[in-house]
Amino acid sequence: MPKLRSATTTHGRNMAGARALWRATGMTDEDFGKPIIAVVNSFTQFVPGHVHLKDLGQLVAREIEAAGGVAKEFNTIAVDDGIAMGHGGMLYSLPSRELIADSVEYMVNAHCADAMVCISNCDKITPGMLMAALRINIPVIFVSGGPMEAGKTKLSDQIIKLDLVDAMIQGADPKVSDAQSEQVERSACPTCGSCSGMFTANSMNCLTEALGLSQPGNGSMLATHADREQLFKLAGQRIVTLAKRYYQQDDESALPRNIATKAAFENAMALDIAMGGSTNTVLHLLAAAQEAGVDFTMADIDRMSRKVPQLCKVAPSTQKYHMEDVHRAGGVVAILGQLEKAGLVHGDTRTVLGGSLAELLNEYDVSRQPSQEVVDFYRAGPAGIRTTKAFSQDCRWPELDVDRAEGCIRSLEHAYSLEGGLAVLSGNLALDGAIVKTAGVDDEHLCFRGPARVFESQDTAVAGILDGTVKAGEVVVIRYEGPKGGPGMQEMLYPTTYLKSMGLGKQCALITDGRFSGGTSGLSIGHVSPEAASGGTIGLVADGDIININIPARSMVLEVADSVLAARRVAVEARGWKPLDRQRQVSFALRAYAMLATSADKGAVRDRSKLEE
């Protein structure tokens, strides 16, 4: 029978000092011997996805204590990628994932916590906490802050839905008036919550459901809706049950590594492909798998991308649907239900609810025979009222969207595409692979061949797009923006947004060893590995070189003779794999991150071989 980790600090005469300090936090004699549950919050006033989390940690804590546990809350940092984007702040976004993972490990292990509830929401916070949870391997439940309501405004006598990306595109389009741009800006982000489309934050919160580590509705129930409060309360109750199963019943199935197995990672990837999730999820799943000791690689993703269909299309791939519409159609469970019918997910994986995924689908899939309680849960909808408060409204859709032929979530027979929303490309330009979000690429652009226009940084690329240097038909190459070369692997949302603003969104392709926001659409290929700073071929591309992209064939080829590339490699190695004339201040903290960073095909995690020397 495993001993409570916290007993190290609460039992024995030699721990009198530790107990004295625990008493100073409010613990009593009756609390020593109960499981100590870390409530890992991420409240901050900097981030709309986290601005409403301040009191939610204590909401969970009260439920933990009522169920027989002891709750202790602490906070992690949280970076808003949208606010950090387009300037030096974006260098810190991906590295913050590692800091979050480490800070959770430090706090939980230093104080010998027995289990965790992770309250996350936005881009790097969920992945960072996920990495920590799988690293530490104690009982855990994830509960996110929930998605923002979609913005709405009236343009050209038509009410349209909006999000952050619309505000960026309108703001950069010289043909859009100041008044219209301001109108969109003021309407795009109306409430607290993670940005309203299938961007990175919402994608990751959906994937925790497929991994079995969060409850139904975690990824899709709006931040503002009263029904979301129940997810937080149940998380507090269920984590105590999980802790007791492990520590009192020696039930190792309650541990996250026995829930998030190889099969569960395949379920998560199948979901990601089917819903057209952010390419960043690939990076984070690879990183989490390494922490879990699961052999899940780019080869697995490539294999799955060829057989899993795209069943859902959500902003930024379409303006018609946002996360509130995904929830109305049954959320993650409904997508997984369609995949199960097609034999594309493993129904025998376990979840934090205690049963199998198949059992969960039978209870919560709105396409089956759900209870009225489940129906009402998925009818929860937006109120259209600007607010920063959680659980502040209880509006409901008049009916569910269960149209699997033309609705938000499709059946296999009516799939948007029989091949899914993400694809792995390879070739001499990306020997270890690259990722493209095919859900955001029009069919006529799946093949593209053109001359390279090379930039040594995102900043020079943005300038080149806006000043007309970039021409229709070119392949924009942005290099030295990978995990090591950036450092920090910046998101390239501004270059892709400005290509659209300049009328080049469907006239150019973009290739980078950096990454893309979940808000990116169009022929945007990221995560090129090896990155330029690690000697990747992308560091050898010259202006005018022909690049041939063929997504159906999963290939990306630089049409330059091997002898020419070999000569270029000698020249670059002589000067070092560094950008030419890049004006960028890189802090000591970022340099330290870069020293251990691996390329994207490894999840941009630390190079463990360097730590084991």
Swiss-Prot record:
It catalyses: (2R)-2,3-dihydroxy-3-methylbutanoate = 3-methyl-2-oxobutanoate + H2O; (2R,3R)-2,3-dihydroxy-3-methylpentanoate = (S)-3-methyl-2-oxopentanoate + H2O. It comes from the Bacteria. This is Dihydroxy-acid dehydratase. The active site is at 517 (proton acceptor). The modification N6-carboxylysine is found at residue 124. The gene is ilvD. Its EC number is 4.2.1.9. Binds 1 [2Fe-2S] cluster per subunit. This cluster acts as a Lewis acid cofactor. InterPro entries: Dihydro-acid_dehy_C (IPR042096), DihydroxyA_deHydtase (IPR004404), DiOHA_6PGluconate_deHydtase_CS (IPR020558), ILV_EDD_C (IPR056740), ILV_EDD_N (IPR000581), IlvD/EDD_N (IPR037237). Pathway: Amino-acid biosynthesis; L-isoleucine biosynthesis; L-isoleucine from 2-oxobutanoate: step 3/4; Amino-acid biosynthesis; L-valine biosynthesis; L-valine from pyruvate: step 3/4. Keywords: 2Fe-2S, Amino-acid biosynthesis, Branched-chain amino acid biosynthesis, Iron, Iron-sulfur, Lyase, Magnesium, Metal-binding. NCBIfam families: ilvD, PRK12448.1. SUPFAM superfamilies: IlvD/EDD N-terminal domain-like, LeuD/IlvD-like. It comes from Aeromonas salmonicida (strain A449). One of its GO terms (cellular component) is cytosol.
